[in-house]
Amino acid sequence: MRHYEIIFMVHPDQSDKIPLLIEKYKKIINDNNGIIHRLEDWGRRQLSYSINKLQKAHYILMNIEVFPKTITLLETDFRFNNIILRNMIMSVKKAIVELSPILKLKDDKKEKK
């Protein structure tokens, strides 16, 4: 099995469907004997440039360990799911389990308040 980092952006008007979408992808990964090392919901964030006349998107980050055929299933679903604006799947050398810098920054801001 290989390690992957996946980031996908969801249409901001569909933020209420995020938990269902995450459960769907968790099920695909678990049904294919995969392991989820990290799952982060970054929430709604400003886009660097507009995509389909949108200025914001809901970001989800996953670090998983799966067989390549599972990545093919996920890529196909990302491609044909019209609420997903963009996605990026990167192969990584090892599992990343610590918090991402974006989530660390959010936690630091909450602690200061």
Swiss-Prot record:
Entry GO MF terms: small ribosomal subunit rRNA binding; structural constituent of ribosome
Family the entry assigns: Belongs to the bacterial ribosomal protein bS6 family.
Keyword Nucleotide-binding (UniProt): no
Organism taxonomic ancestry: Bacteria, Pseudomonadati, Pseudomonadota, Gammaproteobacteria, Enterobacterales
Pfam hit, one: Ribosomal_S6
CDD domains, per database record: bS6
Record function comment: Binds together with bS18 to 16S ribosomal RNA.
NCBIfam families tied to this protein: S6 (TIGR00166)
GO BP annotation list: translation
Alphabetical keyword list: Ribonucleoprotein, Ribosomal protein, RNA-binding, rRNA-binding
Descriptive protein name: Small ribosomal subunit protein bS6
GO cellular component terms, A-Z: cytosolic small ribosomal subunit
